[in-house]
């Protein structure tokens, strides 16, 4: 197809004027290019530029002088102070438990309870007559009276002791054995107001009563029965002559 178009008469007629135009224009272009002058391009010399810039830079002395002038003219700009941070109270400083007596505050209820114990007054600091409790626990058949005495001392220690008192002569002994040995003196003599071999008497002491009142009652009973005995067991017995008929 391409060969046919080239060989056809229409294609040859259109291609001839184009070729002629090109042939006519080529010598003109060549002449114009020949008449023109070449333009010179600017060449940059980096070394020369560096020298010029170095000349423009100030020396060290000038630079220091400029710095001093700038510092003298300028004003110091102070940044505003930062607001203080809110102080956070530590758990140990947070004290809600307060003593009602001295006003001290504590961080825990346990610490407050331990502190309150120091305000408590010790009990039983003095001996009073009302603190002495006398109780009659037991009465022996031989007529002895056993009394338990509890005394509250200042140290809070109760001292309990037993008083063994003879029901006939009202002598007191530290032990029941000593009282029993003493009672034999009364029994061997046979001077018993009741006529029996033994007497059973009991004395009740109430707290707050006086022992002298009980003694007076006992002596009044003895005088009503047969009067006071005319001998003392602590003295040797008198020699008695016995006549037999």
Swiss-Prot record:
**InterPro entries with a match to the protein in the record:** AZF1/2/3-like, Znf_C2H2_sf, Znf_C2H2_type
Note the zinc finger regions (C2H2-type) by start and end residue: 97-119, 164-186
Q: In which tissues is it expressed?
A: Highly expressed in roots and at lower levels in leaves and stems.
Q: Name one Pfam family in it.
A: zf-C2H2_6
**Subcellular location(s) of the protein:** Nucleus
Where is the segment annotated Disordered?
Answer: 1-57, 112-141, 193-231
Sequence ranges of Polar residues compositional bias: 1-15, 123-134
Offer a single GO CC term for the protein.
Answer: nucleus
Report the superkingdom from the record: Eukaryota
Whether Nucleus counts among this entry's keywords is yes
Keyword annotations of the record: Abscisic acid signaling pathway, DNA-binding, Metal-binding, Nucleus, Repeat, Repressor, Transcription, Transcription regulation, Zinc, Zinc-finger
Q: Name one GO biological process term.
A: negative regulation of DNA-templated transcription
Q: Is Transcription regulation included in the keywords of this UniProt record?
A: yes
State any further remark: Plants overexpressing AZF1 have increased sensitivity to salt stress and barely survive under high salt conditions.
**Per its record, how is this protein called by name?**
Zinc finger protein AZF1
Source organism: Arabidopsis thaliana
């Amino acid at each position: 197809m391409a060969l046919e178009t080239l060989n056809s008469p229409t294609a040859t007629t259109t291609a001839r004027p184009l070729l002629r135009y090109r042939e006519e224009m080529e010598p003109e272009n060549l002449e114009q290019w020949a008449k023109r002058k070449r333009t010179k391009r600017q060449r940059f010399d980096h070394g020369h530029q560096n020298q010029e810039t170095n000349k423009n830079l100030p020396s060290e002395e000038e630079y220091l002088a400029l710095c001093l002038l700038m510092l003298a003219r300028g004003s110091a700009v102070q940044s505003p102070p930062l607001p203080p941070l809110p102080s956070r109270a530590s758990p140990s400083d947070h004290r809600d438990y307060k003593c009602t007596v001295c006003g001290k505050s504590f961080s825990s209820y346990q610490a407050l309870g331990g502190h309150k114990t120091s305000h408590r007054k010790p009990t039983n600091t003095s001996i009073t007559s009302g603190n002495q409790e006398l109780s009659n626990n037991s009465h022996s058949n031989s007529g002895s009276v056993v009394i338990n005495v509890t005394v509250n001392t200042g140290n809070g220690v109760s001292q309990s002791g037993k008083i063994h008192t003879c029901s006939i002569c009202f002598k007191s002994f530290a032990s029941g054995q000593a009282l029993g040995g003493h009672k034999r003196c009364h029994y061997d003599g046979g001077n018993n107001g009741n006529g029996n071999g033994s007497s059973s008497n009991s004395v009740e002491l109430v707290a707050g009563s006086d022992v002298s009142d009980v003694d007076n009652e006992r002596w009044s009973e003895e005088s009503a029965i047969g009067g006071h005995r005319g001998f003392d067991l602590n003295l040797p017995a008198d020699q008695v002559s016995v006549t037999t008929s």
